[in-house]
Regions:
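Acidic, glycine-rich A-domain
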Residues: 1-222
Length: 222
């Protein structure tokens, strides 16, 4: 160490340097929360868990963006509570409020557009959802399907699965944090494939995500 200064100052070949990648700085986390009316009874708990997670990532210098989605009056609204470098914005997560419907396919398409704009490489996309897409605006008829269909059940799940596939193709595979009923677990797997983590309850949200991020960081270091 006493000779370390000689390498850059004098070009001393006896001393070499090696850049150690900052794996914490390489990882970026996107968190997307289902804010439809189905989350009404646990919205305070969701907000608290989201805040705990964002605060922990902020202290670890891991950039995180927190978003939510719901559909109101035929429009799918994507709300941003804090951006990657907005370290003072965690308190806004407590503004999380559940209302309206959830058109999951359109929400995933919007997120795909946002992620492709930013162009980050080491990204972890986490989606907290009950995997029960449902909207009052019908699916339009396309191709061999001449008539419009309700946005619910199999057609809605298929629509969301198609958009999840596009996210994977664009290099941003979504990881589903499933918080729904037993009967909707198969829908979660249809949409997200093997990338489904079932939460025993919303109270396990921050702890579960912490373990996922720890595993991703270990993978980056290896």
């Amino acid at each position: 160490p006493a000779l370390a200064w000689r390498a850059p100052a004098l070009g001393d070949g006896r001393v070499f340097d090696r850049q150690q990648p900052n794996t914490l700085g390489d990882l970026i986390v996107d968190l997307l929360l289902d804010a439809s009316a189905s989350q009404n009874r646990r919205q305070e708990q969701l907000a608290t868990q989201g805040y705990i997670l964002a605060e922990a990532l902020t202290r670890c210098a891991i950039p995180v963006r927190v978003l939510s989605y719901c559909s109101v009056s035929g429009c799918t609204v994507l709300r941003e509570y804090r951006d990657y470098r907005e370290n003072q914005g965690n308190n806004r997560i407590f503004e999380f409020a559940a209302a309206g419907w959830n058109r999951d396919g359109l929400a995933l398409r919007e997120v795909d557009w946002l992620l492709r704009r930013s162009g980050e490489q080491q990204r972890l996309l986490l989606i907290l959802t009950d995997a029960n897409p449902n909207d009052d605006t019908r699916l339009p008829g396309t191709g061999n399907q001449f008539f419009s269909r309700d946005y619910s059940g199999r057609p809605a799940v298929a629509d969301a699965a198609e958009e999840a596939t596009m996210l994977r193709r664009h290099g941003n595979p979504p990881l589903c944090l499933f918080s729904g009923r037993e009967g909707d677990l198969s829908s979660a797997r249809t949409i997200y494939g093997r990338d489904v983590v079932r939460l025993p309850s919303v109270g396990w949200f921050a702890q579960t995500v912490g373990k996922i991020i720890q595993g991703r960081l270990q993978a980056l270091e290896s």
